[in-house]
Each structure stands twice: as C-alpha cells, then as structure tokens.
C-alpha cells in the first residue's frame, strides 16, 4: 500500500512539472517565444525531409510576424495548426476558387520593414536602371501587381476610365498567378520588367506628346500579359509534341495567340471594363491582341522592315491611330527583348535565366529523343555564344531603328549598354575552349533563333 501511494504521488508530481515546462515540447504554453521555437523546429524538420519550400512568404520571420498580428490565436493550438493558419493566405493565392476572397496580402505582411523601400523604388520607376529583382524581393514576390497598379495610378487611368480599384487589383493578381514561377525566365518578374520598360518608352518625348489614355491602357495591359501562362518551352517544341495549342492555333504564333486569349479570358473574368460599351471592349481585346502578336520573334523582320520603311520615307504621323499603334507594337517588341540594353549586373542575370530555360527544354528533348532545338543543348552551347548572337542579329537591328525614331538619351544609353555587354560576353567567350568556332556557331543559331526559338 505504501509503495503504491509513493508511485501515485510521483506520477502526480511528474505531471505537474511537465505542465509547467516551457519550450519546444510545451503545447499548453501561452508563451509566443516557445511557439516560435516549435515553428522553427518544424521548418527544420521539413527541410531535412526534403519538402519543397513554398515560393513566397515562407521565411520563418515573416510567419512569426503574422503570428504576432493574430491576437485571437488560442494558446492551446498545436504548432502544426499554427503553421497551417499562418500559411492559409498563401494557399488562397494559389487557388482560383478564392481569387475574389478578401485576404491579407503579402504586401501587408511586409509593410513595416519593406513597403517603405518598395514605395521609394516606385518613385524612380521611370529610371532605366530600375532593379526589378530587388523590387520583387521588397514586394515579397508581388512585383507585377505592385508595379502595374502603381503605373495605372501614375498615368491617371483609374480616374480616366472610372476603374473599380478592387476589380483592378483582382485582375492584376490573376495575371500574376497565371505566370509560372518555376520558369526561370518567362515568369511574372519578366512581365514586370517588360511593363517597366514599356513605361519608360511611353515617357519618351515623341510618344508622351501623342499617346492617348487609351493607348497607355492597352500598352500596359499588353506588356503585363504578353507572356501569360507561358509553358517554358518554345513553339517548335509544342508542334513536334502535337500539343493541343499548336493544333488550336494551326502552328502559327502559337504562344502569342495563347497569351492573348489568356489575357482576354482574365479581362472578362475580372469584369474590370464591364461598364464600357461592348464595342469598346471588343476593340480593346483586338488591339491588345495585335500588340501581343507583334512579340512573335519569328515575325521580327516583317515588323522591322515596315518600321524601317516608314522611317526612310519620313511618313510616320503619330496623330494617325494606325501609325501610333505600329510604334506601340515596336515599343513592346523592344521592351520584350531589352535585357541586353540594361546594365551588366541586370543583363547578366537575365541572360543566365533565359539560357537555363533553353537548356531545360533541351534536357527534356534529349530525354524523350525529340531532337534538341537550336541553342538548347547545354553540352554544345554557352551563355556567351547565345547572347552575342542574340545581340548581333536581333537586338542591335531593332534598337538601332528605334533610336532613329526616338533619338534620345535613353536610346543612346540602351545602345551603349548593348555594346558594353556584348564586349563583356566576348571577353568571357574567349576564355572558353570552343571559342574558335563561336562566330560561325552563333551566326547560324541566331538565324534559326529568328525563325523559331527565343521561347517567345
């Protein structure tokens, strides 16, 4: 009897001590620091187990800040449930079902520490040295939404077209969601970069004095959606794999048609312009399509020849809507391939990303014995080789004609960057073992690039 009583007292004592303990094993503790320790421990376990990290907002410090903002969280909730609760706004973002739901955006999460810096950057959104990679980090991966919304406001489009700001933000969020973050290059950050470049071109004196609010609206929407739902492979890949998109668009501007139709779908789904007459909405959709279709790199010579012809004759009249639309098409084409026109630090990052996407396609083609597309074989190609050919045969001819049309400081800056970046890549190329055959290789590949590649 005495021994039994002692054991009972010992068990009661152990239970009482356990209930008072703090730290990673205390699920009854109301101490937020203890909950944070448990959360960090769970993150470490997930990383060791090989779980794929979430694309955005998964940093423990961000989660911890959200935890502090939730004053009504009960202390008895387990660490696992806390993590689920804190991540729910990310799950909402990935679900089309909840697109209209009111949730705390990641921008709100970062207001205190980062949003001030992001706003400061937006004050210089017209600067050609704008660092879209830094801006994307400061906005927690929401660069496309933040930048485009700001530009709509900056150009007075919200007031002019009487846009519902909730619908506008929802439309921009849908656009951003429909870009694939797993694409190294054709993702929402690229779309944001192109949109920022388009804004710079719209500010150029010739355009700024002639474009209408309608022109600006179409240009910004087309820039933001020009690669919408890009699969990360090029048109020839879709054709040789009998992809349904190639069949649907009869092997002609397959990706560009898909980007355009996807943009139209989001425009209609958002209801952003539902207050406009049907004729205006139809005209908007058609003109956005004409802008996006102009980014098909296989039609580069067609657009460039027409533009050059007008410049030679001196008959471009920007009071003519058709001529103005052609110039906007050329502006979007420039914005789409302006990476070599940025400073070396930015340009090099873009070069590495697009080459990674090329090589990923080549890896798939090798795996399934499809025949590797030009510029997509990581065993025979190099970033330097691809970039030098790209600049020589596509970028320089386009931006030379653009400088004829708009001979400004920006145009000379862009051409200057192309020259410097090309020289830098040539320097790196000379260090490569196969550099002797580089000239012939990139000339051939660049001609093929114009016809079919560039993952446009």
UniProtKB/Swiss-Prot annotation:
Documented EC number(s): 3.1.4.53
Enzyme kind, highest EC tier: hydrolase
Gene: Pde7a
Alphabetic keyword roster: cAMP, Cytoplasm, Hydrolase, Metal-binding
Keyword Hydrolase: yes
Cofactor: record remark: Binds 2 divalent metal cations per subunit. Site 1 may preferentially bind zinc ions, while site 2 has a preference for magnesium and/or manganese ions.
Origin superkingdom: Eukaryota
Subunit-structure text: Interacts with CBFA2T3.
Residues annotated as catalytic: 186
Protein name as catalogued: High affinity 3',5'-cyclic-AMP phosphodiesterase 7A
PANTHER family (alphabetical): CYCLIC NUCLEOTIDE PHOSPHODIESTERASE (PTHR11347)
Coiled-coil zones: none
Record function comment: Hydrolyzes the second messenger cAMP, which is a key regulator of many important physiological processes. May have a role in muscle signal transduction.
Biological processes per GO annotation: cAMP catabolic process; signal transduction
A cellular-component GO term for this protein: cytosol
Tissue specificity field: Widely expressed with highest levels in the skeletal muscle.
Comment field on protein domains: Composed of a C-terminal catalytic domain containing two putative divalent metal sites and an N-terminal regulatory domain.
Required cofactor names: a divalent metal cation
Catalytic activity field: 3',5'-cyclic AMP + H2O = AMP + H(+)
Annotated family: Belongs to the cyclic nucleotide phosphodiesterase family. PDE7 subfamily.
């Amino acid at each position: 009897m005495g021994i039994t009583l002692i054991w009972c007292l010992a068990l009661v004592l152990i239970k009482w001590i356990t209930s008072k303990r703090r730290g990673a094993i205390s699920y009854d503790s109301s101490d937020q620091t203890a909950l944070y320790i448990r959360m960090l421990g769970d993150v470490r376990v997930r990383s060791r187990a090989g779980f794929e990290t979430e694309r955005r907002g998964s940093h423990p410090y961000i989660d911890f800040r959200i935890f502090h903002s939730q004053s009504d969280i009960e202390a008895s909730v387990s660490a696992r449930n806390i993590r689920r609760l804190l991540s729910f706004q990310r799950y909402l973002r990935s679900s089309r079902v909840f697109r209209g739901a009111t949730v705390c955006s990641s921008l709100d999460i970062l207001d205190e520490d980062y949003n001030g810096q992001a706003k400061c950057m937006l004050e210089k959104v017209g600067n050609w040295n704008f660092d879209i990679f830094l801006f994307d980090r400061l906005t927690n991966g929401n660069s496309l939404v933040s930048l485009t919304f700001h530009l709509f406001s900056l150009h007075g489009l919200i007031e002019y077209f009487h846009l519902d700001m909730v619908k506008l933000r929802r439309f921009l969020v849908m656009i951003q969601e429909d870009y694939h973050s797993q694409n190294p290059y054709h993702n929402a950050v690229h779309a944001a970069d192109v949109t920022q470049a388009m804004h710079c071109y719209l500010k150029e004196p010739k355009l700024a004095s002639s474009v209408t609010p309608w022109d600006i609206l179409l240009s910004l929407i087309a820039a933001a959606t020009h690669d919408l739902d890009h699969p990360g492979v090029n048109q020839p890949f879709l054709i040789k794999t009998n992809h349904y998109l190639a069949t649907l668009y009869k092997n002609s501007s397959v990706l560009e048609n898909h980007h355009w139709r996807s943009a139209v779908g989001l425009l209609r789904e958002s209801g952003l312009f539902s207050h406009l007459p049907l004729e205006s909405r139809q005209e908007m959709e058609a003109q956005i399509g004409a802008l996006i279709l102009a980014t098909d790199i296989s039609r580069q010579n067609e657009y460039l020849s027409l533009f050059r012809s007008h410049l030679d004759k001196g008959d471009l009249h920007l009071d003519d809507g058709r001529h103005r639309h052609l110039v906007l098409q050329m502006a979007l084409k420039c914005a789409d391939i302006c990476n070599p026109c940025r400073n070396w630090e930015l340009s090099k990052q873009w070069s590495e990303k697009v080459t990674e996407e090329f090589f990923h396609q080549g890896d798939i083609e090798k795996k399934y014995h499809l025949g590797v597309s030009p510029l997509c074989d990581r065993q025979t190609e190099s970033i330097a080789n691809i970039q030098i050919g790209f600049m020589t045969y596509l970028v320089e001819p386009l931006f030379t004609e653009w400088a004829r049309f708009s001979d400004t400081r920006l145009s000379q800056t862009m051409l200057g960057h192309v020259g410097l970046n090309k020289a830098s890549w040539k320097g790196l190329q000379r260090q490569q073992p196969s550099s002797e055959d580089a000239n012939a290789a990139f000339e051939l590949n660049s001609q093929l690039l114009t016809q079919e590649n560039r993952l446009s």
